[in-house]
Amino acid sequence: MKRYDFHVKQFMIEEAIVFLGLKERFTIENRMNRQHKIILALFLSALSGFIDILGLFGIGKMFLSFMSGNSTRLAFYLAEGEFLLALPYLFLIASFVFGAFLGDVVKSRFPGEVLLAILTTETFLIFISFMMIFLDIKDEWSYLPLTIAMGLQNTMHIRVDDKIIGRTFFSGVLHSLGTDISQAMQKNKPWGAPLLDLLIWVVAVSGAFLAGILQPNIPTQTLLGLVLIILLLVIVIIIMLNKKQPDFR
């Protein structure tokens, strides 16, 4: 009877693994690699939400990673004939595009260390913004490096299963959530796929929520300093992981 119970439990565990879509990854090394990638992507999602709020508070309701909103406001001010009000949005959009361009150049230059190279460059850009605020340059110019950093971040391809995660396109995350729920209900995808989408969105909103609470009471320079410290720690962790898991790049 005990032997029968053991086989039943083993069968149930295997079925749960298949249901969640983890069967192909059920080795300690691969599972840890996947978990590390998800954690990194969640951190980057929270970071983009956090930095977006800094832009909303710091430069008059302008987004630093949400270019759809900036493009809409650019068009609105152009239609109203308010060209001076439209100009900062144009600068932000151009900075985001330049960030994507820079990210692709970095990827081409360091194909074997993409994550590390992109994160290091992103940290340097945030440091530039930190120093500009420190030098009392507190207008739109001090936030442009942050927008470049957000465009840069979107060139990272953190692949988990069939998803590329860790970007700042949260409209895309919500779209993916809807389609993945449909696919899971049709049994074409595991339920782990929409759960991951939901988790990424919740973490991004949480990052923005945290910045919204802290920003009124803590100077932007201090918040960026904390972001820099955390990013440096993440870079150190990635270097350590690269030694243990060569495919974590």
Region spans (language model):
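C-terminal ends and interior cores of transmembrane alpha-helices
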Residues: 124-137
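Perimembrane loop-to-helix junctions flanking transmembrane segments
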Residues: 65-83
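Short, Lys/Arg-rich, polar N-terminal cytosolic tail immediately upstream
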Residues: 3, 9-35
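Hydrophobic core of transmembrane alpha-helices in multi-pass small-molecule transporters
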Residues: 46, 139-165
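Hydrophobic/small/kink-forming positions within alpha-helical transmembrane segments
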Residues: 97, 101, 201, 205-206
